[in-house]
Amino acid sequence: MSYAPSGPDGSTSGPTYREWVLQPQSEYRFELAPNTSIGIKLLDGYAECYGTELATRVVYLFGGECKAVIYTHSGCTIEIKPATEYTSEETAMGHYQSASILFEQMRVLSLATVNGALLDGLNPQNIPATPPHILVLGPENSGKTTLCKALINYAVRGEHDEWSPILVNVDPGDGAWSVPGSISAASISTPLSTSTSACPLGLSASTAPTVWSSNALIPLTYWYGHTEIQRNPVLLERIIRNLGARIEERLVQVGSQGRASGLIIDTPPAFASSSSGDRRNSLIKACIESFKVNIILVIGQEKLHAEMQRTYGRSINVIRLPKSGGAVDRDPAHRRRVRNHQIQNYMYGQKIAVPDGCDKGEGSYLFQHEPTSDLSLAPSSTVVSFDDITIYRIGGESMAPSSALPIGASRAVSELLPLHVDPSSPSSGVLNSVLALLASAASDGEQYDEELVDLPVHGFIIVTAIDIPNRKMTVLSPTSGTFTGQTAVMASIDWQEIA
């Protein structure tokens, strides 16, 4: 590795940028502090960010406490403004690329089998001729989301450009395409970019008007309402199975190419922790059954790999991959800031300022492959009546102790029971709560409250003010609209706008 420590005027003091010459199979790593941004330009050679190829002579902006790497397999020169961070020749991307080749072969063989084109002797390695359904497990700060994103990006930019694998996120602490507390899935057909920690899996159609098709994702979302799986694991298992059932319905409807594309599941770090107990095992089993998993990828942990091999190795291929050296520790304070940024991003969109050292008139500054000016939203603040929106809480703090349950009743029933919330009650906790607006039930018949847990989400709002005497509340939403007759669910996720 090397760099050219000179400024735009050729001086050698106080450079505003650096030119890094990356050797083959090496990567440039950076971690951004709050309220900072950098611009990265590929000058020559080949480079990618988690499988998304960078174009030459285009400035890519990164901000929002982004922690990422620029990797090259053949060598390249990049320009960084302002000068920051370091390079490393220790990278796990080669291992991730090898895994992606295996999954590509599975897709091709699966499609050939469906089309009747697979002939005996053309698969000497006995690679499974089934779509790859991949469950990714690993401890906290192991780079699970990074691996999932890289595998998706390698799939959609390969020789078969019509692959559209489904990316599933069952980590409620992540937020993915919406807000923390949710789990979701989306079909991906073009690469996902990395520019900010608030958009770990790219943008969705609900976050801002976009141009590039990969950002116009319409995810299927279910509301859990907490960031920790221990809060209500019964509810989490229920919505994981609901999500799996909806994905199965979609796979029946799509063509053979879509089914052969497979899916990749990102999981919470608690799935890798033995301290989570039996609930953790039941949630892993729910994922395997609901998404028909045939491959388990374990990042780093040898003990976890041995456990998964012992439990599922007879029917599922369990593979261990090394943890990337670029995976960094995120302390609780950082995670809280990121979750706050995700909610703010959902409401207001995202814009990264051009960093110091970059000429404001220089070329195109892209964020998520979009012009930076196109990513802001103008959220709507609306006053609604308490009677316009029916609010529920699923189990949670209002659950009765086991000793108080009726004879024969089970805790599982209580954990899934919707409880009506009265906003006029001082103890309701509605103020500053994130409310998930539920989609309408498909059936025209009589609906029961118990069925609310099975409904997906079509949007989120935040209660910013309560007027108890007039029985009104003010809600913030990304777009304007009417909320009359809506059903919403609240839990433990809240947000306050900071001036």
Descriptions of predicted regions:
Residues 211, 278, 283, 448-450:
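Short, well-ordered helical secondary-structure segments
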Residues 246-316:
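Phosphate/Mg2+-binding loops and adjacent switch elements
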